[in-house]
Amino acid sequence: HKKGSTVSNLSSSRALRDVTEIHGGKYFSSPVGLMHVINEMKKKKAVFGGEGNGGVVYPALHYGRDALVGVALFLSHLSRMSMSVSELRSAYPKYEMAKEKIELSNGKTPDKVLEKIAKSKLAGTLDRRDGVKIDFQNSWVHLRKSNTEPIIRIYTEAGTKEGAMKLALEWKQKINSLL
C-alpha cells in the first residue's frame, strides 16, 4: 500500500509508530475505541490504522475493522519481500506488553485516582486523552478506567517481557499507595 500517516490507539504498541516513521510517514494516536481511531484517521488522512486486537482499518477498501484485510496485506507483503515469517518479524521493532488491573473499593473512583496520578510529578510525557498515558524513552504505561466496573487497567510496553511486567507491577504499587 502507499506510504503515509498511520493511527492506532494509546494502548497499542509503539511498533506501528516506529515503522511509520522509518518509512517517512507521520504517526498519530487516539483514545481507545474503533470510532476514535477512524475519526483520527479521517482527520489526518491516514492510509492505515487499527487497534492492538489485530483488526486493521484500511481506508483504501473501507473505514471498518477488518482482520482479513490485515491478513491479506501481511501475506502480500511477505510474498513481495520473499522472506519467511520469522525473517520478516526480526526486521521489525520488538516490544513486549503486560497488563494488570486494580479493583477499587470503599467508594474510590477511578477518575479521582487517575487525576491524582496526573497531577503528581511524572518522569515522562503525559497524555490525558484517555485516562493517563506516560511515555518514557524506551517504554510506556497507560492507566485507564473500566467503563463497566470500578477498576483501573494498567497497560505497559517495554523492550522485554520482564521490563513490561516490572513496569506494570511498579505502577500497580504506586496506585495502591495512593488508595
What label would you give each PLM region?
Residues 2-179:
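Phosphate-binding and adjacent anionic-ligand microenvironments
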